[in-house]
């Protein structure tokens, strides 16, 4: 899906794309873990990584990959769109990265099926695949967030 399509789908469901900071918090919790499940490199049972082109896997193939908040499948297989524009860290919500106009390069998080195991971390950021929010890619997915 495109970033715009993902954003529109989430809105249709009464939700929104998470910000980059929200995505990272959901993936790593408060203990600063390297991967959603802890600090050990992933196994093939936990995530899809290091695979060839166009080799995503059904998400039900994986287990033991829950984040501290119980969120599943946040590392590997497909990058996730977030609402935030790609900007250098450190994160600052007031630096324009949360502007929702479609123009800027958007961030993706989590790593994809072809990412190496040591790059599907809770802090991994992408922008190469997401340069155009109007273009989709087979290696980008999304999840929706809601306000509580």
Walk through the language-model features, giving the residues of each.
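Short, structured beta-strand segments at or near domain termini in extracellular proteins/domains
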Residues: 136-148
